[in-house]
Regions:
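Short beta-strands and strand-loop turn motifs
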Residues: 48-51, 178, 216-222
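Active-site-adjacent loop/helix segments that line or gate small-molecule/cofactor pockets in enzymes
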Residues: 1-35, 198
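A generic structural signal for well-ordered alpha-helical segments
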Residues: 10, 70, 242-243
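Active-site and channel-lining beta-strand-loop segments
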Residues: 28-49
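PLP-dependent aspartate aminotransferase-fold enzymes
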Residues: 95-215, 234
């Protein structure tokens, strides 16, 4: 199918993510293949994929061994829910992830994507405390400018107002604290490195909301969509101390 016809079909039928449905797609780039870190469009232009396919193609495009593994699995068993059943590949992968995970993390709950993973984690935290006889623990804490997904619960935890306003009101109980942006931090402008003020703000939020109402704290290792903010040394250790307290 030629490029012009693909553009016509896209204009009539394709609704791109994070894109208004009435956006004019005339002249849009249509990517048709990839190899390593490069992509090619339907007009033969080559691009460097610096985004790694939205961070999910770190191993590169065109990996035939990965395609073969996926095809082999689909030929044996394409899909079956792991409710009260299991299957060898899921069990083996869960065991491998448990082996690689730090500390006593040894259980794996598979999801289909990041937003669903965040939703599931919030649900897990709520269910845990309800079973512990603490049903009032429903709130979660996350950072300003954080990105945790776009489904309703995950979007509530997300701290990017520009992608939230059209879907409000969102799920209540998602509390925000400062991000670790040293460049614009009013609390440590005169310090050579960002201090732990942002971590201490989590404790302040817990006390303000009531510790008996908090179920979980959601933090990206490095904030990405909000500006690539690396936390200062000791940040996560301090957060761990606060949560344990």
């Amino acid at each position: 199918m030629d490029h012009e016809h693909l553009v016509e079909l896209a204009e009539a039928h394709l609704w791109g993510h994070f894109t208004a449905i009435n956006n004019n797609v005339d002249g849009m780039r249509i990517l048709e293949r990839g190899d390593g870190c490069y992509l090619w469009d339907t007009e033969g232009n080559r691009y460097f994929d610096g985004l790694a396919g939205l961070f999910l193609s770190q191993l590169g495009h065109g990996r035939t061994e990965l395609a073969k593994a996926a095809g082999d699995q689909a030929a044996i068993l394409g899909y079956f829910p792991i409710w009260t059943y299991g299957h060898p590949t899921a069990i083996e992968l869960a065991a491998k992830l448990a082996e690689l995970a730090p500390g006593d993390i040894n259980r794996v709950f598979f999801t289909t994507g990041g937003s669903e993973a965040v939703e599931s984690a919030w649900k897990l935290a709520r269910q845990y405390f309800k079973l512990k006889g603490q049903p009032e623990r429903t709130k979660v804490i996350s950072r300003n400018l954080a990105y945790h997904g776009t489904t309703m619960g995950a979007l509530s935890i997300t701290g990017l107002e520009s992608i939230k306003t059209m879907f409000e009101p969102l799920v209540p109980g998602a509390i925000k604290v400062p991000e670790t942006n040293h460049y614009r931090c009013p609390m440590c402008q005169d310090e050579p490195h960002c201090s732990l003020h942002a971590a201490d703000a989590i404790e302040e939020a817990i006390l303000a909301e009531g510790p008996e109402t908090i179920a979980a704290v959601f933090l990206e290792p490095v904030q990405n969509a909000g500006g690539c903010f690396e936390p200062p040394p000791g940040y996560f250790q301090r957060v761990r101390e606060i949560c344990d307290k």
